[in-house]
Amino acid sequence: MNKLEELTCALEVNKAVYDAVRKNLKVGVSEQDIYELTKTVVDKMLPDVSHEFIGDFVGGKRCSLIGGDATDYKLKKGDGFILDLSVRCGNTWSDTCRTFFLGEPSAEIKKAYDTVLKLQSFGATLVKPEICAEKVKIDAENMLKDMGYGGMMPHHMGHLIGAKPYMTPAFDIGHTDKIKTGVFFTLEPGLYKPDSWGLRVENDYVLQPDGAKLLFDYPTEIEYFIV
């Protein structure tokens, strides 16, 4: 397989994991349970291909920490759950994120989630060949400030992927390299309220001469992730 085929392969695994989580996530399930479910799906999907995975498995108030390893924390009604998953198929890594909700989210969270989706769409219009990487973060932060969410995205706006699950330049302050045609990259806007909630949505793209092409065709609307 070439690199694009390997990434496509990995992204099919990401989809299968999210499908499995939607079916199995419920009150009383632990972060560790979801980690084990993820491992089962990844191994089943790639029995004859060199593979591995890493990810963030955080629920409840732990979502405000942005990420972290799975613990024995058991999910409660009203919790969010962030599953940020990187899968290696052959020599190429994917990196996507979805946020699930155990029950109807509050109006505050719904508004924040909608803002994240708008920011992701905005980011996809920004990434063009030869753009300075940090400009994507700067413009994203300006948009968040205008919408009343200034300072609530304390991480980069995305990064390159490929031979590693995280590669530079990232779309972050201080990353002044220009983005080249043909690279694989992510956009992962997120919003976080300390000791309360957090949410993030991440998709993978390839940069073509005319701009970003989405490679991860999986739902993002919040209703799809309410379980």
Which residues are covered by each model-predicted region?
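Active-site neighborhoods and metal-handling regions in enzymes and metal-associated proteins
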Residues: M1-V227
